[in-house]
UniProtKB/Swiss-Prot annotation:
Species, as recorded: Caulobacter segnis (strain ATCC 21756 / DSM 7131 / JCM 7823 / NBRC 15250 / LMG 17158 / TK0059) (Mycoplana segnis)
Function: Involved in pyrimidine catabolism. Catalyzes the deamination of 3-aminoacrylate to malonic semialdehyde, a reaction that can also occur spontaneously. RutC may facilitate the reaction and modulate the metabolic fitness, rather than catalyzing essential functions.
Name of the protein in its database record: 3-aminoacrylate deaminase RutC
Encoding gene (name): rutC
Annotated EC: 3.5.-.-
Family annotation (InterPro entries): RutC, RutC-like_sf, YjgF/YER057c/UK114
Reactions catalysed according to its record: (Z)-3-aminoacrylate + H2O + H(+) = 3-oxopropanoate + NH4(+)
Length: 129
């Protein structure tokens, strides 16, 4: 199965060996996405709303680079460091998914660096039926 690595223009170097996204058979797999600043530091430490917005903008960029839109998202995997971030994350999340909602799950866990409070990985189906 052929696959294409998706790296939006202006994307920084990942802190680990992975691609921002991979397109295979009309499906875009977006890696777990965190709110990094341009220097690979934590952006908006502890701010769930600001981090969620940046994360979803990054995910949107990956999907659009692959030829899709946020309406093509079929699944989101959400990771929060604490349940106090659930409501602020959902507030921003609802702005990006105003119509039919994709499937999702949300778990509480530790993240790669202190200050990160939200991570999201997504799957979007951009292929034609």
């Amino acid at each position: 199965m052929p696959k294409t690595v998706i790296t939006p223009p202006g994307t920084g170097t990942p802190i680990a060996p992975f691609s921002p996204g991979t397109l295979a058979d009309g499906i875009v797999y977006v890696s777990g996405t965190l709110a990094f600043d341009k220097d690979n530091n934590v952006a908006f430490p502890g701010d769930a709303e600001a981090q969620t917005r940046q994360v979803l903008e990054t995910i949107k960029s990956v999907i659009e680079t692959a030829g899709g839109t946020m309406e093509d998202v079929v699944m989101n995997h959400i990771f929060l460091t604490d349940w106090v971030h659930y409501a602020p994350m959902n507030k921003v999340y609802a702005e990006y998914f105003p119509g039919d909602k994709p499937a999702r799950y949300c778990i509480q866990c530790g993240l790669v660096k202190p200050g990160f409070v939200v991570e999201i990985a997504s799957v979007a189906h951009i292929g034609k039926p």
